Amino acid sequence: MARQATRLISNLSTKLNPSSPTMSASPLWHQYRYFGSPPPPPAVFVDKNTRVICQGITGKNGTFHTEQAIEYGTKMVGGVTPKKGGTEHLGLPVFNTVAEAKVETKANASVVYVPPPFAAAAIMEAMEAELDLVVCITEGIPQHDMVRVKAALKKQLRTRLIGPNCPGIIKPGECKIGIMPGYIHKPGRIGIVSRSGTLTYEAVFQTTAVGLGQSTCVGIGGDPFNGTNFVDCLERFIADPQTEGIVLIGEIGGTAEEDAAALIKESGTQKPVVAFIAGLTAPPGRRMGHAGAIVSGGKGTAQDKIKALKEAGVTVCESPAKIGVTMLDVFKQRGLA
């Protein structure tokens, strides 16, 4: 079955190539049209107008988290499970393909709860259907599959992928796509972006406790090949008028935090940024939790990341327990609280 999934990914990669005959002839790229004026695009990827389908809706995880999303108030409009099209689940229509679901429900986002061997193919299917946003929660997707997905993402401009191996994205009070506990979030002023799911929840709880709340929270995931990075989110947070402060939670491995520091410095933003970097005592060459959390070749150390962030004017916390109070202190120092 894994080989079948690999072949499907390869076929979809060909279809996603804009120069291929399949792409130019496919009706999927022209069938979704707005009648009347469409709502304005969300400031940070999602808002109350986001219409979401669930890929893998009839599975255990898909069922549970779709129920949670509906209860939170997310506009869940349908689901996709091959060979179960035409049925209903949780009161929502189920379709065989993402393309069918998009036509019938006018969905513009998808959340993927599909087992690792088939998750990349599910992402590619959503890309072929030209959804605006795909959020992949699945952990353990083979890296060679994600390399193909990453290459396909670079060949198109319509679809944004958040994840994989991430908690998802939430705009408190409006839209929850993912596995995060909704009740700890509160509409507010802080944009949160993180490579760690549990540390995201910690930052959310603390910013809620000090009365600042959150504008949008994005878990970008800890895998080496993900769809959305710190820079993508920071650009949105800097431009978003609702976001008055930013929390960035990074970890060892890669150069994503250094890239974020460069953007913050170049942007000249006056919005306060507070960061925490996990893995300060991690030994080189040993993976720490996430697949991407590894110091190799002398690069990706916590010390390097902390130095780069401080040089960009970011306030760096030594403990994750101090994220909320640190942000509140910075707000008070700048007369924002």
UniProtKB/Swiss-Prot annotation:
Residues 1-35 form a transit peptide. Expressed in roots, stems, flowers, leaves and fruits. Pathway: Carbohydrate metabolism; tricarboxylic acid cycle; succinate from succinyl-CoA (ligase route): step 1/1. It comes from the Eukaryota. Pfam families: CoA_binding, Ligase_CoA. Keywords: Ligase, Mitochondrion, Nucleotide-binding, Transit peptide, Tricarboxylic acid cycle. GO terms for cellular component: mitochondrion; succinate-CoA ligase complex (ADP-forming). SMART domains: CoA_binding. CoA binds at T58, G59, K60, N61, K84, I137, T138, E139. InterPro entries: Cit_synth/succinyl-CoA_lig_AS, Citrt_syn/SCS-alpha_CS, CoA-bd, CoA_lig_alpha, NAD(P)-bd_dom_sf, SUCC_ACL_C, Succinyl-CoA_synth-like. The active site is at H290. Its main location: mitochondrion. The keyword Coiled coil does not apply. GO terms for molecular function: nucleotide binding; succinate-CoA ligase (ADP-forming) activity; succinate-CoA ligase (GDP-forming) activity. PROSITE patterns: SUCCINYL_COA_LIG_1, SUCCINYL_COA_LIG_2. Its EC number is 6.2.1.5. The keyword Ligase applies. GO terms for biological process: succinate metabolic process; succinyl-CoA metabolic process; tricarboxylic acid cycle. Heterodimer of an alpha and a beta subunit. NCBIfam families: PRK05678.1, sucCoAalpha. Belongs to the succinate/malate CoA ligase alpha subunit family. HAMAP family: Succ_CoA_alpha (MF_01988). This is Succinate--CoA ligase [ADP-forming] subunit alpha-2, mitochondrial. It comes from Solanum lycopersicum (Tomato). The lineage of its organism: Eukaryota, Viridiplantae, Streptophyta, Embryophyta, Tracheophyta.
